Amino acid sequence: MTLQITETYERLRASHISRWGIVQTTYPQNIAEHMWRVWLLCRDWGAAAGMPQHTVRQACEFALVHDLAEIRTGDAPTPHKTPELKELLAGIEAQIVPEVAELEATMAPEARELWKFCDTAEAVLFLKVNGLGAHAYDVQHLLMEQMKRRLMDSVLDVEVQDELMFQFERTIKKT
């Protein structure tokens, strides 16, 4: 691990970078908690869907680092990320933590889809439990629709897609 990523992890430990700047919540989720919860979902749901271990491992590895750049940039709300802003942020993030950009560039498409599904699912689950008001409800449902659409358009086998949706729906009913 390079000095740059070690320093980034130290900042993560020492600071409280909150997510959900545009959505009122009962609890100020931080980036470390979010990445850990995405890791749990990748590990559990990937295995339940019968995905190869190396694919699940790759998604899990990325889940633990995917938002490290937000320690310096802050959390840019997804609804405000235009394609131009996404491209700009990707360039900035690659300069801040190049290891994360390198890891993402080498991810298998199936691992990327598992991670992205779990990343969005974690946000939906967090808002279901902690979101306050109509805006939080609207954002939760917008994210859920985006997640479902992306999954249907993904490279994942239909059986894997079905199992991931089953795991998500079972989890959201329990919350």
Curated annotation (Swiss-Prot):
The keyword Repeat does not apply. Co(2+) 1 binds at H34, H66, D67, D119. Keywords: Cobalt, Hydrolase, Metal-binding, Nucleotide-binding. One of its GO terms (molecular function) is hydrolase activity. SUPFAM superfamilies: HD-domain/PDEase-like. The keyword Hydrolase applies. It catalyses: dATP + H2O = 2'-deoxyadenosine + triphosphate + H(+); dADP + H2O = 2'-deoxyadenosine + diphosphate; dAMP + H2O = 2'-deoxyadenosine + phosphate. DATP binds at R19. Its cofactor is Co(2+); Zn(2+). Uses a typical 2 metal-ion mechanism to dephosphorylate dATP. Zn(2+) in the first binding site is replaced by Co(2+) in excess of the latter. Co(2+) 2 binds at E70, D75. Gene3D superfamilies: Hypothetical protein af1432. Homohexamer. Catalyzes the hydrolysis of dATP, dADP and dAMP into dA. This step is essential for Z-genome synthesis (containing aminoadenine instead of adenine). Specifically removes dATP and its precursor dADP from the nucleotide pool of the host, preventing the incorporation of A into the phage genome and favoring the integration of the Z-base into the viral genome. Belongs to the Caudovirales dATP triphosphohydrolase family. This is dATP triphosphohydrolase. It comes from Cyanophage S-2L (Cyanobacteria phage S-2L). The lineage of its organism: Viruses, Duplodnaviria, Heunggongvirae, Uroviricota, Caudoviricetes.
